[in-house]
Each structure stands twice: as structure tokens, then as C-alpha cells.
């Protein structure tokens, strides 16, 4: 079962990386929904292998999959205010579900990471989103280490490096344009 758990995690990482190569926001959200569902399965299997803190990862990935589906369904009629309200509602849902599945302080790492990611989705400025990703990735990475989530660790490391690279590249381009 450990092999299957890790396979789902690595598959989720591949879907995550691939999602950002897709053309439309809607396609990205569908891919992220699949990614969250694969990570949900990954953490469920890790939980069944004895990683008791993996329950929080499983549950919070379920909340994120639901969040992404809601964003897809409301995409055309969503205002900026509605996006903010959804971010607050899903941040509260992450906190509540995180508290309900709490098994140790390790759970707090993933709760923080997922709240930061949920807030990031409501910010239209790409470099600010990248900063939130860089802040949340170490929390999720540490959670993944404690739960032996190979796919999760790879995903967070690549996400952090990708966000950092883009942040520095676009920041530098902005300075060159201003000069």
C-alpha cells in the first residue's frame, strides 16, 4: 500500500506541474481539482499505512478540490468581491476542517499552507501570488516530510523554485522597464 500511496503522490505532482502549462484558467482549475483529488487519495493511503497526521492532508485536499470546483462553476459570474468572499469562506473551511482532523502540531503546518494558498487565489497580482506560494511551500514541505509524502515534497520544492524564479525574473523585468 505504501507504493500505491507514493505513486498517487507522484502522479499528483505531475498533474500539478502540467496544470500550469494549460491555456485557460478553467483548464488549470480542472487540472488542480484532479491534483487535489490525487493528493487526497495519496494522503488517505498514507493514513492507512499508519501516518496518522495524513488525515489532515487528505481532508484539506478535499476542501481544495471543492474550492476549485466552486471557482469553475462561478467563473463567468464571479466579481472581485465574490472572489474575496469565497477566499474567506474557504479559508474558514480549511481552518475548521483542519481543527476537526487535528492529530498533532504537525497538522498546523498544512493548515497554514492551505489557508495561504486559498488567500493567494483571491489576489489578481501574479507576483503577490508567487510570494504567497513561496511562503506556504515550506509549511507544506515540512508537513510532507513528517508524513513521508515523496510526491508532496517534490511538488512543494518545485513550486517554491518555480515561484522564486518567476518572481525574480518579472521583478527584474519591471525594474528594466522603469529605467
Features from the language model and the residues they span:
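Alpha-helical membrane-protein topology signature
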Residues: 1-179
